[in-house]
Amino acid sequence: MTNAELFGEGINLMISGMGFVLLFLIVLIYAISFISTLINKYFPEPIPAPVAKPVPSAVPTDNLDHLRPVIAAAIAHHRRQQGLK
């Protein structure tokens, strides 16, 4: 066999192999989609029950009045340490 014949056979083999792989991947995609459809048909995911929203209370929950003296004391302590006042 000459180099040209070997090169031609190599190209032929490469194209045949790539075509076979492409065909196999296409069949695999359709098989996976079909199996997914079957699984979803016979084993559907349960629908979650709606969660009741909590009723907002009349008293605000973010009342931080009890933290104001603590924050003021922390600021005063920091300023004393830094020599600012």
UniProtKB/Swiss-Prot annotation:
GO biological process: sodium ion export across plasma membrane
The UniProt record lists the keyword Cytoplasm: no
EC number: 7.2.4.2
Membrane spanning residue stretches: 15-35
GO MF, one example: decarboxylation-driven active transmembrane transporter activity
Catalytic activities: oxaloacetate + 2 Na(+)(in) + H(+) = pyruvate + 2 Na(+)(out) + CO2
Keywords, ordered alphabetically: Cell membrane, Ion transport, Membrane, Sodium, Sodium transport, Translocase, Transmembrane, Transmembrane helix, Transport
GO cellular component labels: plasma membrane
First-tier enzyme category under EC: translocase
Cofactor dependence: Na(+)
Membrane topology annotation: Single-pass membrane protein
Compartments where found: Cell membrane
Main localisation: membrane
Pfam families (UniProt xref): OAD_gamma
InterPro entries named among the record's database cross-references: Na_pump_deCOase (IPR005899), OadG (IPR023424)
UniProt family annotation: Belongs to the OadG family.
Subunit and partners: Heterotrimer of an alpha, a beta and a gamma subunit.
Protein function: Catalyzes the decarboxylation of oxaloacetate coupled to Na(+) translocation.
Name this protein carries in UniProt: Probable oxaloacetate decarboxylase gamma chain
Gene designation: oadG
